[in-house]
C-alpha cells in the first residue's frame, strides 16, 4: 500500500534527499538535472518555482510514500500549455525499491486525482522505446500507445526515441 501527497515546502527536503540518493541511478537513463538541483540553496529556489507552478495549476508534483511513510518515488503531472485539459505524466522510483509495484500503484492513484480532483480530460506519458517496464506500467493502467517520436532526447550523446501513450477520462 502506498500513498501520494502533493509536494510542499515542508516535505520538499524529502524530495531533495531522494534525488541526491538516486542521482547516479537516474542519470544512467534520463537527462541529468541541472547542477544547482543538488545544491540545497539551488534546490530551495527550484522548489519555490515548482510550488508557484503548483499554486497556478501548471504542475502537480507528488511524493510517493510506502506504507511506512518513506519516500520511494515521485510522480508529476505537467499541464500542457497548448491544451489546459491535458497533462503529461512523469515519475521516478528509487533504485532500491524498483520492481516492487510502486510505479503501477502510484500511476493508478495519480490518474484518479487527475480525472476527479484536477479535472483533466487526457493524460499523456512518454517513455524511451526501450523502457519496457515503464510501458507495462502505463498499459496496466489503461494507457494506449499513441506514437513514436524519433530522436526525441539525447542521453549520454545518444539519441533516444520516445514511445508516447495516452489515456482519456473514463
Give residue spans per PLM region.
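Conserved GNAT-fold acetyl-CoA-binding loop/helix
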Residues: 27-48
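Acyl-donor (CoA/ACP) binding surface of acyl/acetyltransferases
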Residues: 1-14, 18-28, 61-170
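A short helix-loop-beta-strand connector motif used in the catalytic cores of GNAT acetyltransferases and
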Residues: 35-36, 48-63
Amino acid at each position: 500500500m502506498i500513498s501520494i501527497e502533493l509536494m510542499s515546502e515542508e516535505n520538499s527536503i524529502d524530495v531533495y534527499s531522494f534525488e541526491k540518493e538516486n542521482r547516479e541511478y537516474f542519470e544512467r537513463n534520463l537527462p541529468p538535472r541541472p547542477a544547482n538541483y543538488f545544491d540545497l540553496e539551488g534546490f530551495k529556489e527550484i522548489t519555490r518555482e515548482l510550488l508557484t507552478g503548483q499554486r497556478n495549476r501548471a504542475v502537480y508534483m507528488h511524493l510517493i510514500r510506502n506504507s511506512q511513510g518513506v519516500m520511494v518515488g515521485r510522480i508529476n503531472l505537467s499541464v500542457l500549455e497548448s491544451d489546459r485539459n491535458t497533462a503529461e505524466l512523469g515519475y521516478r522510483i528509487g533504485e532500491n525499491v524498483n520492481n516492487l509495484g510502486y510505479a503501477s500503484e502510484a500511476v493508478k492513484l495519480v490518474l484518479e486525482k487527475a480525472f476527479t480532483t484536477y479535472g483533466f480530460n487526457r493524460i499523456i506519458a512518454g517513455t524511451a522505446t526501450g523502457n519496457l517496464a515503464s510501458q507495462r506500467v502505463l498499459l496496466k493502467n489503461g494507457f494506449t500507445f499513441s506514437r513514436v517520436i524519433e530522436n526525441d532526447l539525447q542521453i549520454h550523446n545518444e539519441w533516444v526515441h520516445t514511445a508516447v501513450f495516452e489515456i482519456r477520462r473514463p
